[in-house]
């Protein structure tokens, strides 16, 4: 199984069955169905697509002609999000590969929509530099929500606590780290974040504590062999999802 197909299947289970993303990715990584070099890409695709969901939906909606985007089958929307994430946020993935793999997934899981998915993704390739977001002066909540993919409720809370400029700086910092680090959520039922960090320090594993989540830690590189992950002492979960729990 490829990282893209595994990511698609996980995203569907998360949406349909309400599975927690950290538990879903943990089960998939433990199953051993992915080659070792695909594990990191799989994790990035799942969490990246979830983390950028609001932005991806905002961008994809006007590109869909005929059937309104919200009325598309869930399977089609997930394929579009997964592919659009690669086109917009994964610089090392060639656009042609993102489009072709998205169409191939659609042929396998929703064959009737393959031509539409192909058209939408190719249009996104052509128009991605012309994407227009809401004006921050006119509607700061809508701008922050769609540009940074944060719920309107959290945007209102952040704005009331720190103001627009500081809110932007914070969200920029969080998003900048998302593609560099793998974010883990410490299982505080078993140990504290401080205890978890001490374990990493003893083995010389570099890490950073998350800025907003009190239970998160960021690590560089492939974490699939991390002892603590295998022991259930932590889960892969992006910081935005940790805040939503």
Model-derived features: positions:
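Class I Rossmann-like S-adenosyl-L-methionine
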Residues: 1-225
């Amino acid at each position: 199984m490829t990282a893209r197909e595994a990511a698609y299947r996980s995203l569907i289970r998360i949406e349909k069955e309400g599975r927690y993303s950290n538990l879903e990715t943990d089960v998939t990584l433990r199953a051993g169905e992915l080659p070792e070099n695909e594990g990191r890409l799989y994790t990035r695709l799942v969490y990246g697509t979830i983390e950028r969901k609001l932005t991806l939906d905002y961008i994809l909606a006007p590109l869909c002609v005929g059937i309104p985007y919200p009325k598309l089958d869930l399977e089609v929307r997930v394929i579009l999000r997964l592919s659009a994430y690669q086109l917009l946020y994964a610089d090392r993935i060639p656009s042609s590969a993102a489009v072709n793999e998205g169409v191939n997934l659609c042929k396998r899981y929703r064959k009737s929509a393959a031509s539409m998915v192909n058209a939408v993704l190719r249009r996104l390739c052509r128009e991605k530099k012309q994407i227009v977001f809401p004006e921050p002066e006119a509607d700061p909540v809508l701008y922050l929500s769609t540009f940074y993919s944060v719920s309107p409720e959290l945007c209102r809370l952040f704005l009331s606590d720190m103001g627009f400029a500081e809110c932007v700086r914070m969200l920029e910092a969080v998003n900048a780290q998302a593609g560099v680090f793998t974010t883990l959520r410490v299982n505080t039922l078993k140990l504290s974040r401080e205890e978890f960090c001490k374990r990493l320090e003893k083995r010389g594993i570099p890490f950073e504590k998350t800025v907003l989540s009190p239970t998160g830690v960021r690590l560089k590189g492939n974490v699939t062999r991390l002892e603590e992950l295998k022991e259930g002492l932590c889960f892969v979960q992006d910081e935005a999802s940790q805040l939503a729990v």
